């Protein structure tokens, strides 16, 4: 498509005829008596010089506008032609028609940028022409002004000289009249001796004759210069100034018409680009081609494809069948307690996948309380998963067991301490042959997320109260709760994921200190009060800010940061690595060597912060802001400078960058 439209021939002819006719009609205006009177007066030159200066100022101002406009338009075109390509890139066949149509509609910005490029070129040419016109007219005005001032000065100087000769001549005549009235016999002493009155009269008459001659000559000279200036030079200068004024004004009128024509062409070509006259699809037709129902149908239908049938069933929702334990069939009411106990210090809480996204840790389930009669036994047999993400240098030596899953029957829920010890050994990342006994793999349920906890039955009986949550080491809290992530962390993450992801300034805005302190004290009195974190209905923004402040308070109150202080030297080495890939692999290794409590708690928090980042457009929390807030809380201080906050911020940035590589996906 052509970038510019041709000038309409009729418009050009009409403009030309109008201009010629207008010139013929207006030519007689300068022949009117009132205008002739002004042009023939002494004020004509100064008046026309002033008028020409106004035209030059108009030309200069229009030139500045054109320069600013083409600079602005050029920058706009450059940014527009580059930026629209960075959004809604279509890759693959999974994109919806909405995304494809947005991509097509934004493509019109590139086409309009091409159309505007010719407009910018025209503006640049106009600016060059107006600049040359201004420079030329300024020089001509200066030349005419200097010439007129010089001629006026010559006439003025001649008249002034004639006036001085006249004054000298009149003064001598007055002296001669006085001398005639004096005594004839009186003498006058001079440097040359005494002179009689007669001698004085003779000398004075000679001076009068000379002064009279000079006076007459200067009068004739001044009159001659004045007549020449008035009859010849001034009309020529006036005509020249008048021509310059009309010339610059006519040139500016033409430039103004060119500006309007190019602007009209820009608008017309832009309209043709958006709504083509041929069969090409317009911007509106692309926008109307969106099929939301078809997009949703295609998205849902892909779950029927081969290899995705397992996604249709949530293993967490498979009901548990009630089966009485064989040992309970002998009618013995008072049975001795088991001869073994689960030892948390021997890693009785196995590593497994957890999920805190869109799941409340306090959703009650009747099947969980009815299936297991003993809360202690239930909490001692969590599901097993060994998928703790390995760094690249170790991944090849350890086999994955993330898919080993099966429903755990009541008969297999009790494991002896020797068996537990053997499982612990097989889960050791340093073990060269990490194998889990086949009979145990078949009896473990590895797909059940641990984010579902009970508000009343998750704690051992008799120890619900007076167990502090804040200021307690993560290992002690995990051992007490018999879970992988502290309940307060899961509950706070659940609330913010559900209600606060789109809330502006989440984690940046703090809640009332008294409210945070009061809720903290209630939870320290009784861990069951964690349920108080759930906001009331309807909730306010302050309720969500309170949860965010409580979560920050929990991590800040830990005796040791989630990334232990012992790793501060290694973290410093990591941050000094320049290569991004090597730096991420190094941090991956540090994360892999973390204890289970720190590993899984850090994993839950990091994935939650990434979900907050995904809603940056709504909550205005970018990566830098989150790292400034969480870095000093999660990472240890610089071993060489405890006041170096940037060390902790940079460590948090690397941690978020390596999260997908270092942690199991949710």
From Swiss-Prot:
Tagged with keyword Transmembrane helix: no
Name of the protein: RHO GTPase-activating protein RGD1
Compartments where found: Cytoplasm
Species name: Saccharomyces cerevisiae (strain ATCC 204508 / S288c)
Any one GO CC term of the record: cell tip
Record key words, sorted: Coiled coil, Cytoplasm, GTPase activation, Phosphoprotein
PTM notes: Phosphorylated in vivo. In vitro, phosphorylated by IPL1.
Sites marked Arginine finger: 508
Protein function: GTPase activating protein of RHO3 and RHO4. Acts in concert with MID2 in cell integrity, which is functionally linked to the PKC pathway. Involved in various stress responses. Required at low pH for activation of the PKC pathway. Important during mating response.
Region (Disordered): 1-21, 325-439
Coiled-coil stretches noted in the UniProt entry, renumbered to this chain: 139-226
Disulfide pattern: none
Biased composition (Polar residues): 355-404
């Amino acid at each position: 498509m052509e970038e510019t439209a041709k000038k309409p021939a009729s418009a050009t002819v009409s403009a030309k005829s109008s201009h010629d006719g207008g010139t013929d009609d207006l030519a007689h205006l300068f022949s009117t008596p009132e205008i002739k009177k002004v042009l023939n007066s002494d004020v004509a030159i100064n008046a026309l010089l002033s008028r020409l200066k106004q035209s030059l100022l108009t030309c200069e101002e229009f030139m500045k506008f054109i320069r600013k406009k083409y600079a602005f338009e050029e920058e706009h075109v450059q940014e527009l032609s580059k930026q629209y390509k960075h959004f809604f890139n279509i890759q693959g066949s999974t994109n919806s028609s909405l995304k494809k149509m947005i991509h097509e509609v934004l493509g019109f910005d590139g086409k309009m940028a091409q159309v505007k490029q010719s407009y910018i070129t025209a503006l640049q040419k106009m600016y060059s022409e107006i600049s040359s016109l201004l420079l030329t007219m300024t020089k001509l005005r200066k030349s005419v002004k200097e010439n007129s001032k010089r001629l006026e000065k010559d006439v003025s100087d001649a008249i002034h000289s004639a006036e001085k000769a006249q004054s000298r001549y009149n003064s001598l005549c007055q002296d001669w009249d006085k001398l005639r009235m004096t005594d004839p016999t009186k003498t006058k002493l001079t440097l040359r001796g005494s002179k009689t009155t007669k001698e004085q009269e003779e000398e004075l008459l000679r001076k009068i004759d000379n002064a009279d001659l000079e006076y007459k000559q200067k009068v004739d000279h001044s009159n001659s210069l004045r007549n020449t200036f008035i009859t010849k030079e001034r009309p020529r200068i006036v005509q020249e100034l008048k021509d310059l004024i009309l010339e610059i004004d006519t040139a500016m009128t033409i430039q103004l018409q060119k500006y309007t024509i190019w602007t009209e062409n820009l608008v017309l070509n832009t309209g043709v680009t958006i709504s083509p006259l041929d069969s090409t699809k317009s911007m509106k037709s692309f926008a109307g081609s969106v099929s939301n129902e078809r997009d949703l149908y295609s998205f849902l239908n892909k779950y029927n494809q081969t290899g995705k049938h397992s996604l249709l069933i949530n293993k967490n929702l498979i009901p548990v069948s009630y089966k009485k334990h064989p040992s309970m069939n002998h009618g013995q009411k008072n049975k001795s307690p088991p001869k073994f106990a689960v030892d948390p210090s021997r890693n009785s809480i196995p590593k497994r996948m957890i999920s805190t996204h869109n799941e409340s840790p306090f959703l009650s389930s009747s099947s969980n309380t009815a299936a297991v009669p003993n809360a202690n036994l239930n909490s001692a047999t969590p599901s097993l998963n060994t998928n703790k993400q390995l760094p690249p240098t170790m991944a090849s030596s350890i086999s994955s067991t993330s898919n080993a899953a099966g429903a755990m029957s009541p008969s297999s829920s009790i494991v002896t301490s020797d068996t537990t010890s053997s499982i612990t050994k097989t889960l050791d990342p340093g073990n060269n042959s990490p194998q889990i006994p086949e009979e145990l793999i078949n009896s473990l349920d590895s797909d059940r997320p641990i984010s579902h906890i009970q508000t009343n039955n998750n704690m051992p009986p008799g120890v619900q109260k007076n167990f502090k949550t804040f200021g307690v080491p993560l290992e002690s809290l995990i051992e007490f709760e018999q879970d992988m992530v502290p309940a307060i962390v899961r509950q706070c993450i659940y609330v913010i994921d559900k209600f606060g992801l789109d809330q502006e300034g989440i984690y940046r805005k703090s809640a009332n200190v008294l409210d945070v302190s009061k809720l903290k004290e209630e939870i320290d009195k009784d861990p069951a009060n964690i349920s108080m974190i759930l906001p009331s209905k309807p909730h306010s923004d302050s309720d969500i800010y309170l949860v965010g402040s409580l979560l920050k308070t929990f991590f800040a109150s830990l005796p040791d940061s989630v990334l232990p202080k012992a790793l501060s030297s290694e973290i410093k080495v990591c941050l000094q690595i320049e290569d991004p890939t090597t730096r991420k692999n190094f941090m991956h290794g540090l994360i892999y060597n973390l204890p289970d409590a720190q590993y899984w708690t850090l994993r839950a928090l990091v994935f939650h912060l990434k979900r907050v980042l995904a809603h940056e457009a709504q909550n205005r929390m970018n990566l830098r802001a989150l790292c400034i807030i969480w870095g000093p809380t999660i990472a240890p201080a610089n071993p060489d400078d405890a006041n170096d906050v940037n060390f902790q911020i940079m460590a948090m940035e690397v941690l978020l960058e390596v999260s997908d590589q270092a942690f199991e996906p949710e």
